């Protein structure tokens, strides 16, 4: 952002410190006006014809901008991906344990990647793995939405579940 002497335009549309329009002035007049008020002349819209400048305390403005950015970064939620590994021949109790963990992750706001690794000749029966993943996604349906359908990648099949937004 250009301030004071960095502004090269001959004429500028001037906006006062309290937001009122002061009209089109020469750059030097605008600089003098800002200097008399002990404030800075800041170029806010360089592409306008003529460019728009505002009289303000630039140090205070920068401080406010940094404060806003810091607040936005603080309010950003980092969504992490948790993985739950299943097998095509998973027993009922193991399935329920994995399901409880996945639901806990989803309620916390994390995404869940449910994956099945096919070992040996089990890869010839992909439909069994497909059924396990379908059952898993149906069991998590109350707290999640399917972000990506089950798909094969090498010897693994996986699907991604995202938490539901109940806002």
Curated annotation (Swiss-Prot):
PROSITE patterns listed in its UniProt record: IF3
Chief location category: cytoplasm
Biological process per Gene Ontology, one example term: ribosome disassembly
Subcellular localization: Cytoplasm
PANTHER family: TRANSLATION INITIATION FACTOR IF-3 (PTHR10938), TRANSLATION INITIATION FACTOR IF-3, MITOCHONDRIAL (PTHR10938:SF0)
Subunit description: Monomer.
Functional summary from the UniProt entry: IF-3 binds to the 30S ribosomal subunit and shifts the equilibrium between 70S ribosomes and their 50S and 30S subunits in favor of the free subunits, thus enhancing the availability of 30S subunits on which protein synthesis initiation begins.
Protein name: Translation initiation factor IF-3
Gene designation: infC
